[in-house]
Amino acid sequence: MPEINTNHLDKQQVQLLAEMCILIDENDNKIGAETKKNCHLNENIEKGLLHRAFSVFLFNTENKLLLQQRSDAKITFPGCFTNTCCSHPLSNPAELEESDALGVRRAAQRRLKAELGIPLEEVPPEEINYLTRIHYKAQSDGIWGEHEIDYILLVRKNVTLNPDPNEIKSYCYVSKEELKELLKKAASGEIKITPWFKIIAATFLFKWWDNLNHLNQFVDHEKIYRM
């Protein structure tokens, strides 16, 4: 694996690069484990390295979507606006559990606490709904990028927030119209959004949002959408 100098990067974020992500093939079958660092180097991504990930979309009882702006300390896509929470299950027994995507949902609960300070008891795995999966690839800069099969998870709940400033620069709840305005700002270069959020907003998000009481029609655990 290539050697990359991380001395100039945020120390807390560099520590997280040692976490072990789940390596998968293009059909989301586990084939091994690799560090977060190696999973996110473009040099490895270009050779086909692919890992499992998730994206959470949390709506409050007013049907507003919780967005976050990634902190400037983040190694990939710093300062970008994105959906509620995006991260990776780790290669450990609890988060490798594949039955009903329980491992991924446990990972989402863990990261909602770590990033946004949401108490674990407010987002139990059984209240995190697994819809479908998308497969995408994107570069952050010349060194770092993403290549993931992303589990799409929806939560509908009012939650307590206490964000970690090392993870999150800002957050806000938005209506559909407010998100459309934010997407226009991103298109004009006024703000930055993450590539996966851009993809999901352009394809599925508003359909889900229009049908929050009838999400079963969008549940598809067989297909992986190639974006």
From Swiss-Prot:
Q: Where is it localised?
A: Peroxisome
What keywords does the record list, in alphabetical order?
Answer: Acetylation, Cholesterol biosynthesis, Cholesterol metabolism, Isomerase, Isoprene biosynthesis, Lipid biosynthesis, Lipid metabolism, Magnesium, Metal-binding, Peroxisome, Steroid biosynthesis, Steroid metabolism, Sterol biosynthesis, Sterol metabolism
Q: State the needed cofactors, names only.
A: Mg(2+)
| A matching Pfam family | NUDIX
**Binding note for cofactor:** Binds 1 Mg(2+) ion per subunit.
Output the Gene Ontology cellular-component terms: cytoplasm; cytosol; peroxisome
Catalytic activity of the protein: isopentenyl diphosphate = dimethylallyl diphosphate
- Which GO terms fall under biological process for this protein? cholesterol biosynthetic process; dimethylallyl diphosphate biosynthetic process; isopentenyl diphosphate biosynthetic process; isoprenoid biosynthetic process; response to stilbenoid
Residues in the active site?
86, 148
Annotated coiled-coil segments of the chain? none
Query: Could you say which EC number(s) this protein's record lists?
Result: 5.3.3.2
Domain Nudix hydrolase, by residue range, is 49-199
Binding locations of substrate: 36, 70, 74, 87
The record's listing under InterPro entries reads:
IsopentenylPP_isomerase_typ1, NUDIX_hydrolase-like_dom_sf, NUDIX_hydrolase_dom
Motif Microbody targeting signal — list its residue ranges.
Answer: 225-227
Carries keyword Signal?
Answer: no
N6-acetyllysine-modified residues are 176
**Main subcellular localisation:** other
- Pathway given in the UniProt record: Isoprenoid biosynthesis; dimethylallyl diphosphate biosynthesis; dimethylallyl diphosphate from isopentenyl diphosphate: step 1/1
Q: GO molecular-function annotation terms?
A: isopentenyl-diphosphate delta-isomerase activity; magnesium ion binding; manganese ion binding; metal ion binding
- Sequence positions that bind Mg(2+): 40, 51, 146, 148
Function of the molecule? Catalyzes the 1,3-allylic rearrangement of the homoallylic substrate isopentenyl (IPP) to its highly electrophilic allylic isomer, dimethylallyl diphosphate (DMAPP).
Q: How does it assemble?
A: Monomer.
Q: Which family does it belong to?
A: Belongs to the IPP isomerase type 1 family.
Name of the protein described by the UniProt record? Isopentenyl-diphosphate Delta-isomerase 1
Specify the taxonomic lineage: Eukaryota, Metazoa, Chordata, Craniata, Vertebrata
The gene name reads: IDI1
